Swiss-Prot record:
UniProt similarity note: Belongs to the methyltransferase superfamily. RsmH family.
Keyword Thylakoid: no
One protein family per Pfam: Methyltransf_5
Cleaved signal peptide residues: none
Protein localization: Cytoplasm
EC number: 2.1.1.199
Described function: Specifically methylates the N4 position of cytidine in position 1402 (C1402) of 16S rRNA.
Encoding gene, per UniProt annotation: rsmH
Name of the protein: Ribosomal RNA small subunit methyltransferase H
Database matches in HAMAP family: 16SrRNA_methyltr_H
Organism encoding this protein: Wolinella succinogenes (strain ATCC 29543 / DSM 1740 / CCUG 13145 / JCM 31913 / LMG 7466 / NCTC 11488 / FDC 602W) (Vibrio succinogenes)
Amino acid sequence: MESPHLSVLKNEVLEIFAPLSEGYFIDCTLGFGGHSEAILKAHPKLSLIGIDQDPHALEFSQKRLAPFKDRFSFREGRFSEVLPTLKELPIAGILADIGVSSLQLDDSSRGFSFHSERLDMRMNPNAQLSALEVVNSYPQDRLERIFKEYGEIKESKKLVSLISEERKKGRITSAEALSRLIERHFKRVGNIHPATLAFQAIRIEVNDELGEIGRALQTIGEIAKGRVSIISFHSLEDRLVKNFFKEWSNSCLCPPEAFRCTCGNNHEKGQILTKKPLVATPEESKANPRSRSAKMRAFEFKS
C-alpha cells in the first residue's frame, strides 16, 4: 500500500532497534505507519501498539498494517496520555517521530501550509484551539512570547505589530494571507520561506508540542524499559530530549556545588546510544527534503 508520507531516518531507526527480540514496541506517533511497518517486518516476534491523535492517519495505518493484525493494535489520543496506560507491558522499544506528516502539510484543508485557504494547524482536528484563534485572538504580548520562545524569531515584536495592524482591518482567516503578510515584510534567507519560523511557533502553541513531548518523556523515564528513540525537527525539541537523556544517564544526583558525592553514585537509568544526534544522509535529504531538519537521539534503559 503506497503511503502519502515518507518516514524519515527509517534505516537509522531499524539499526537502533535491531537488538530487540520479544515484547511490545510502542510507536508513539504512528502517522501513516512507515516506521511501524518496517519494525513489524524486521521483528516477527514483536507486538506493536501505534498511537496517534489524527483519525485520518489511524484509518490509513489500519489498512496498511492489516497484514500484521495479529501483532498490531492502535490507540487514538495524545501519546502523553496513552503511554501511562501501558506501563505494565513488557516494553522492548519506544519510538516517537515528533513532526508534521507530509500529508498534513500538503492537505490544504488542514491549514498547515503557506498556501492553505484555512488557518488551522491542529494535528487533532477535534481539538478546540486552532491557529485561527491564536493569530486573531491572542493579545500582543502573548503572541510575542510565542514567536520569541517557539520560533526563536529575533524580530518578534515587528512581526506581532504587523499582525496587530492587519487584525484591525479584519480577521486573518487563511494561512496564505498570513504567509503573504510576513513575506512582504521579512526577507527570505536562502531557500527558507520567511514565514517558516512563525508557522512553527503557532503550530507548537496550537498542539502544545513541547508540553506533549515533555510529559511523554517524563512517563518514559518512569517506565524505564527497553530502547527509546526520539526524532525531532527543531532545536527546542532536540534540546528537551537531550536534557532528559542526560538526566537519565546521570549516576550522581548530588548538586554541582557538593564537595563530594553522598548519593551513592549509582542512579543512572541506562546509557545514551547516540553521542550526537543522527541525521539524514545526503541521499535521503535529496529524496525527501523534509528529512533535512530531522535529528534522532536514542537511549537504552538498564534491564
